[in-house]
Structure formats: C-alpha cells, structure tokens
C-alpha cells in the first residue's frame, strides 16, 4: 500500500493598499458617452494585485482534490431578489488574466450572465474582478433588464470580455437578439478604469439571424483587429473586424471524437497555438446535457480532434450534476485554469473552478469558495505552488497528497 504524506506547511496572506482610482480618458474622447450602469459599492481598489506570501499558519487539514468542483464560485446577480432566491446562478463565464501587474487593481477580470432558474430575463452581462479567482470585487458592470424583453425571443446573452492593449481599455461584448424580426447583434461597452463604462454601441448586427448570428463569440484582439470565432448552425465560424469593416465568413474545421455538435466555445492563443474549449451535444434536440471538449490548431481554422475533458458528475443533487455549458479557460505560469458552467435538472446553475498542467488532467478542490473564500484561496494557491513542482500526475492522489513510496 502506498503511503500519502501531507506536504502543505505554509499559508497565504493578502496585502493591499487603498488608493484613489484616477479615471483618465484618451485625448479627444467624448466624455458624455460614459455612464455608470450599476451603483458601485466602493471606489477603493488595490494599488497592486494581491500577491500570495508564505506563512506558517495555514491549515490544510481536510483539503482534497475532486474531479469536478463541489462549490460554485461566488458570482452574483445584481438583482438582489433573484440572488436571494437563486444564489450564485451565474452562467457563460469569460476570464481574462491581465498579468502580475494587473489592470486597475486586479489581475483577473471575469464576465458572466446570471441565469436564475433558467430565466433569460436576467441573462444580462455582468463583470467582476479578482486577484485570486475565488474572492471577487463588487459588480463592476451590469446591464439592466431589457425594456423590450420577450421570453425566449428578445433577450441578452453570451457575454465576452476583451482587453484592447492599444487603448488600454477593457471591452465587454454581448449578444442581443430579437427572433420576431430575425435580428441579431453584438453590442459593446468599454471602460478605462473598470468602474465607469460607455453606453452600448453596435459592434455587429444582421437582419438575417438564422444565417449570420454569432452565438458564443470567442474574441482575440490583435493589433487593431478583432479576431472573432463563433457558432452558427452547430459549426464554428470565423470573421475579422478591422477599421469598421467585417471580413467574409470562413468555416473552421473541428472534428469530435464522438461526432458531437458544437454549441458554445471559448478560445485562447497560447504558445503560438490556438486552443478551443467547447461544450457540445450528441443530440441537437438536447443542449442541456452536454460535456466539455478541447482541441488545438496551428492557424485557428483547422483544429485537431476535440476530445472530452470534463463531464457532469451524474449526481442529480450536485449543481453540475446533469450538464455542462459554455466555459472559459486561461494558461498562466505552466498551469491551465478553467471556469466552467454547469447545471442540474432542478435548474440550479453555476460556475466552478478547475486547474491542471494540461487540459486532460483537470482537478477541482473540496474548498467552499462561497462561504470560506479567504481560507479557500490560501489553500488553493498553496497547493498550486506545490503542484507546479510535481514531475508527473502519478505523484498526486485524488486527495491532493504527494505519494511517498
């Protein structure tokens, strides 16, 4: 029998400095375009992203690795009543890692759309920020309920955030549709400080929604060009937007190991490769019970075979027990981090957190990210520090211990 030795002996401490956040617009910017879409709880931000330091006081007792994430992340709906009734029912996440220096006080910026009990009236884009992927800021941005909302017909969805490094601003892009007039669009708001946002502008629109709708856009900003991957008719397609003009539609090749059909995507560029994370269904009539798949490409158009990397737990009582949805990922310091969308058939929705050295060996933890965020962050990042030193997956057991002999 193998012996497991607990290797955690240090803790995590967070230090921050409160400063005044100056709001600087580029020259010749029309300031009247800016308005707060949500009353902010505080104007205090971290001067620098929080850095984790070692401490002898961490208690890793009971820490375990899991296949999925038993705890959701603490991503809230701006509507307090909906949040009280259906807590942390976030969906369709997107995460950006803006590096160790961060942007306006935070390293990680996350967008999502609340989906309380599957109610698309509240499926409006939200943004929060974090320095540890577990403890989040107040809501930085949210769109109100649409005045012309029609259930299943006219609604917002599918938010995506982009960092425009030429203008040093964060941009959120989301989908708006009106099925009754065959209309679909992508709207954009942007901010130079993360707190004050422009009024929505039309980024893309069409009155031929069936043929040209951009479902679940995955966007990379590259030297003045928006490179946009999206889903239409269960196919991944690609267009570019530059100097106010859209390129022609190009088809992407994305085969599946089980002939599944793509529904939603996220895409990153990593080490000169394009990597895609999808949720896909084997039955076009069922987009509730899906798995996650992953593939790579040299050119962003022809991908290798997409293989399954995560599935629901199969337990009806788990928040992610019956289906997975649009998920997002990033690669940082030799590690993948995945914020994944999940649901069960009782209409409980949420976003969980996974990590791994590769996309085929992902782990969750048994930490309670909602009710014990500070301690959970300490344990999570201390384990990550140790895990980076492991030479192979065989050195780690399901309980998060290093194998000794």
Tell what function each PLM region has:
Residues 1-4:
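Positively charged n-region of N-terminal signal peptides that target proteins for export
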Residues 7, 11-15:
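Hydrophobic alpha-helical membrane-embedded or membrane-associated segments
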Residues 14-23:
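Hydrophobic alpha-helical membrane-insertion segments, chiefly the h-region
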Residues 26-405:
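Carbohydrate-active catalytic/glycan-binding domains of CAZyme proteins
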